[in-house]
Amino acid sequence: MNKYILLIVLLFLVSGRIAAQSVTVDAKIDSLQILIGEQAKVQLQVAMDAKQRAVFPSFTDTLVRGVEIVDIAKPDTQYLNDRQRMLITQEYTVTSFDSALYYIPPMGVKIDNKEYKSKALALKVYSMPVDT
């Protein structure tokens, strides 16, 4: 009898961990290096259960100090596994007018009031060499 109770408890613990791992947040940048004034695309991608609700970060005109947002595309939603899962992609077009190495901290996405974070990114901005 005790073995059955222990087995049931273990099944509940394992199923809770499986459900908790069903959300992934990933961030990518298409160019690690750009020249001043060039543009790069930052992509924030969330994979989750179709019944969950996602709230993406609300940026206005800057991603971080020195990195300006040129455009925020509409989120692209794809349904997977017979509409059981969703993949939502949000794309930000960014630029910079100062040469530096910019650290883009992890971006947070709220899924059913719980925050999940992406990995941090870096963007190196070079100045144009002057011809003499």
Question: Can you say where each PLM-predicted feature lies in the sequence?
Answer:
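Surface-exposed interaction/ligand-binding surfaces
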Residues: 20-132
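Sec-dependent N-terminal signal peptides
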Residues: 4-14
